[in-house]
Amino acid sequence: MRSRLAVIFRQSFRPHIITTGITTGLVTGYLFSKYKSTVHANTHANVIIGERMPSLPIYSMSEVAKHTTKESGYWLAYKDGVYDVSSFVENHPGGKQILKTAGKALESCWKIFTIHQIDHVYETLEQYRIGNLPKGEREANEKHQETVLDLFQYDPERVNANETFFIRSQRPFNAETKPNLLVSSFLTSVENFYVRNHMHVPVVNINEFKLEIRNEKSSRSLSYDDLVDKYKSHTITSAVQCAGNRRAAMNNEHQGAALGTQWYVGAIGNARWTGVKLRDLLESFGLDKEGEHVQFWGLDCDTSQRCYGASIPMEKALSEDVLLAYEMNGELLSSDHGYPLRVIVPGTIGARSVKWVNRIIVSDKEADSHWQMSDYKILPPSIKEPQQADFDRVPALQESNVQSAICSPSSDEDGNKIKVLSVKPSDKDKRLTVKGYALGGGGRAIQNVQISLDHGKTWFQAELEQLAQPHMRAWSWTLWTYHINASDIPSKPFDIVCRAMDTHGNTQPDTPLGIWNVRGVMNNAWHKITLQIDDSFLKKAKELK
């Protein structure tokens, strides 16, 4: 048995239980965040959101707690305010998600997910205002909120995170790798690998951990040691990419904002994953010949046991390389990356590679989690707000698409904010070196990466660094390099764009306009950066002439 003493000692405690509707707070805030009500209770202008309004009646939290059904209406509390959101729930697709938060105060949820602390979320909620809480109950809710914040106290310490990542949110922690670090090595180190968390990082006692595998008829479980020691290990090199990578580039004045974490190009990484083939596990329990889907559920749950979950088709689950991984680049998984066990579904969007997995369910149905049923889907461009969508009619995303991005030259400044980047060619060979990554998605290999300096009129082939991989099992990314002679570089600002083509002839669209969707997923348009040659280099070159 391999040694795991360090991890056992580090993680052999469990946090105290904290009561909160953490997941529902995220979903509720997301639904409110873009919807402007046309049918509402009382609208009160010139009022600070959630503050006491003497003209309105008083309702206690015990009264609010009674309103959790269609018959009684759906009530919520926020600060001193009481809100009846029944019409929102009943009249708008997606409103049913609020049912899980009905009868409660929202502070605990929204304090954790600070993305909802914006004016138009509060303003929309205020349109449903019907009353006030009694004096003292707001304070009680806020005291409870202070306890809820302890939920994140067991998150791992992230030393020097600002040097490595562009941090998109602290709670939950979401951070993308700075571009220059992405292309500094073919394998992305654990320390440099992007982090996408949907909730807090769970603490696991490895001595008590059990992996449950079940279908509708039976349930079995394995300890961590049983899984690692009794099943043959398998290693693959695979990129993992968030479906929202490059989301920020989809924002435009004509079509509107792409909602979600505003990733630049760094929500991707490439690593060697070691674990047990999911196929071997299912076969050992006789679960490989039934069910249409395999669901994965993680330990990142609220205390109502609403956990992060996703699913993949059975056909994919039984393929050669889907893993229950316990090692990343030859080391035990870190806490942020799913210790002790995570799913790796190569060629598929990162949302399906569930971290901290402790339940696997073979079923005829997809996972019924919010992230499978009402997120990570490409909505039609006519949908400007998620509340307009009938999510049941839109399939859940699975395979990634062909992708490429420019990572060097780059800056420590957030790429979303840079308009023009000042660069200096090498004094040694008088060339400007451009580097980036490409990924085929779905197991398709990258055939070529091309660079253009004139907005796509002419193209040049980049040099590729890639693994030899089996047909339709090209899970690893490709790194590419292109050198521009200084004599070919204009003195004024100029654009560089890149595009990739896979072995099936799939390539990238020139702009995001034709693939825009309100959730900003699967943006694989040409990546463009604007450069300006450093004045000192131009001056020196002029003197040499």
Please place each PLM-identified region on the residue numbering:
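Extended, aromatic/histidine-rich regions of cofactor-dependent oxidoreductases associated
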Residues: 136-212, 216-222, 229-231, 271, ...
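Mid-length scaffold segments of soluble, non-membrane domains
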Residues: 265-277, 286
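Stable alpha-helical elements in mature extracytoplasmic
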Residues: 94, 106, 117, 121, ...
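Short, conserved helix/loop micro-motifs enriched in His/Cys and acidic residues
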Residues: 235-267
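Solvent-exposed loop/turn segments at secondary-structure junctions
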Residues: 82, 105, 116, 245-249, ...
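Metal/cofactor- and membrane transport-associated sequence elements
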Residues: 239, 278, 293-295
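Histidine-anchored, small-residue-rich loop motif
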Residues: 2-174, 238
